[in-house]
A protein has these predicted regions:
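Gly/Gly-Pro- and Ser/Thr-rich, intrinsically disordered tail segments characteristic of DNA damage-repair
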Residues: 1-127
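DNA-contacting surface of Y-family translesion DNA polymerases
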Residues: 96-222
Length: 222
């Protein structure tokens, strides 16, 4: 998400976590002008739990710490299982059918049952609820090698003018995306394909690639 970030506080003492969080809130409020909520915990999943609770603390500091075992259990008891980071609607419904309604219910579940029914990803979430670190902090992602914008048309496109408008629209979106990432492209490829699910008409597909004279993220050069 563009409106959140994970920070590692290893170089600070546990006693200073809350003060550091207050300083971050004040700095963002001063520089950006928006309020933020902060969750502090031992791993990503629990920090998301803490942040979820912090957002509801509208009249308080909007900073929640989940550090020790007691804090973990108290926090998980008031959190719905569907509010756990990584638990989607389908998994939520499955868990509720098995009498797991809160995050604490999942926390208390048999780890063998979790591994059998929720797989590796579910087990990872389960272990993080118990305080383990299973999802690493990625300090810097690898630069993207390509940016793709493609859509399926709702209706048949039969005119060149309409197709041209769509291509310009997608090229605009692609250039916006690479600019937002601070990147430039060396080439651009346009491809089209007929409806592969329509067996009544002859299939068609084609692609054309244009190499830029120099790397660019300027739409007018595309």
């Amino acid at each position: 998400s563009i409106d959140e970030a994970f920070l590692v506080l290893n170089k600070y003492s546990e006693r200073s976590f809350f003060l550091r969080a207050e300083g971050i809130k004040k700095m963002i409020k001063k520089w950006i002008g928006i309020p933020v909520s902060i969750g502090i915990a031992n791993n990503k999943t629990l920090s998301k739990v803490a942040n979820h609770l912090a957002k509801k603390d509208e009249l308080g500091s909007q900073i929640v710490e989940i550090i020790n075992q007691k804090q973990i259990e108290i926090s998980l008891k008031v959190l719905g299982v569907g509010d756990i980071w990584g638990i989607g609607t389908r998994i939520e419904k499955f868990l509720q059918k098995n009498n797991i309604y809160t995050a604490y219910d999942l926390y208390r579940a048999d780890p063998r049952w979790v591994r059998q029914h929720l797989g590796v990803v579910g087990e990872r979430t389960y272990r993080e609820l118990h305080g383990e670190i299973c999802i690493p902090i990625v300090e810097r992602s690898e630069p993207k090698k390509q940016c793709r914008v493609s859509r399926s048309f709702e209706n048949y496109v039969t005119s060149f003018e309409e197709l041209e408008k769509r291509v310009i629209s997608y090229a605009t979106r692609a250039s916006e995306k690479i600019r937002s990432d601070g990147l430039q492209a060396k080439k651009i490829t346009t491809f089209i394909r007929s409806n592969k699910f329509n067996n009544n008409n002859k299939q068609y597909h084609a692609a054309r690639t244009y190499d830029f004279i120099s790397p660019s993220n300027d739409l007018f050069e595309t």
